[in-house]
Amino acid sequence: MGLSQLGLWLRRLWVLFQVALQVAVGKVFLILFPSRVKQHIVAMNRKNPHFSYDNWAPTLYSVQYFWFVLKVRWQRLEDRTEPGGLAPNCPVVRLSGQRCSIWDFMKGNRPLVLNFGSCTUPSFLFKFDQFKRLIEDFCSIADFLIIYIEEAHASDGWAFKNNVNIRNHRNLQDRLQAACLLLDRSPRCPVVVDTMKNQSSRLYAALPERLYVLQAGRILYKGKPGPWNYHPEEVRAVLEKLHS
């Protein structure tokens, strides 16, 4: 094992400790101060009011919550993106099954907006119309690409009530079928899926959802990770500035 791999595993162990401590403390607070915890959760939910507190709050600090948060935190250790830096040219798959890469969708100096997400992530779907309006308003100066990644809240994982019912993808065909559900929403831009190695999700630290703007192979804008910090309006501001 090389030094870089050893360092990665040491960081993973540290993250494991942090997440385990967070879950343990969260459970204790739920028992000792249930009303105060609920107040805090309700305040967080105001950022995404379309999804009811009762649909997701009871799942906080569950075993499924622990494993999902750990996976997200571990993936973020592999983040290879920074504003101004070179954008990772990860392999992706078109809905037809054809393999390609992210850079294949860049056209000269036109900005390319990347939208990472999945159907089981409520904020991704609730803000889908906002994203479509971006395409309508800026298609003359920018290109757009949706990259469907692993499910945020699969029915056999950290599942929410009254959510889209999709299991974790066991193979590429499962992922392609899940991504095809987005076609019912008329996305108005190409839709591709991440490979089963989740390379784009890892290198762009995209789970559960995230927005980027690329230009000439570099990262012009790096949105914060969802669900609470997934903001299509920030992309609008970037594109308006470019267009002015």
Curated annotation (Swiss-Prot):
Keyword Hydrolase in record: no
Active-site residues, as the UniProt record annotates them: U121
Molecular function per GO: thyroxine 5'-deiodinase activity; thyroxine 5-deiodinase activity
Superkingdom classification of source: Eukaryota
Ranges of the Cytoplasmic topological domain: 34-244
EC number of this enzyme: 1.21.99.3, 1.21.99.4
Catalysed reactions, as listed in the record: 3,3',5-triiodo-L-thyronine + iodide + A + H(+) = L-thyroxine + AH2; 3,3',5'-triiodo-L-thyronine + iodide + A + H(+) = L-thyroxine + AH2; 3,3'-diiodo-L-thyronine + iodide + A + H(+) = 3,3',5'-triiodo-L-thyronine + AH2; 3,3'-diiodo-L-thyronine + iodide + A + H(+) = 3,3',5-triiodo-L-thyronine + AH2
Class of the enzyme per the UniProt entry, highest EC level: oxidoreductase
SUPFAM superfamilies (UniProt xref): Thioredoxin-like (SSF52833)
InterPro entries: Iodothyronine_deiodinase (IPR000643), Iodothyronine_deiodinase_AS (IPR008261), Iodothyronine_deiodinase_I/III (IPR027252), Thioredoxin-like_sf (IPR036249)
Spans traversing the lipid bilayer: 13-33
Its membrane topology: Single-pass type III membrane protein
Keywords of the record: Cell membrane, Endoplasmic reticulum, Membrane, Oxidoreductase, Selenocysteine, Thyroid hormones biosynthesis, Transmembrane, Transmembrane helix
Subcellular location per the Swiss-Prot or TrEMBL entry: Cell membrane; Endoplasmic reticulum membrane; Basolateral cell membrane
Assembly with partners or alone: Predominantly monomer. Can form homodimers but homodimerization is not essential for enzyme activity.
The protein's name: Type I iodothyronine deiodinase
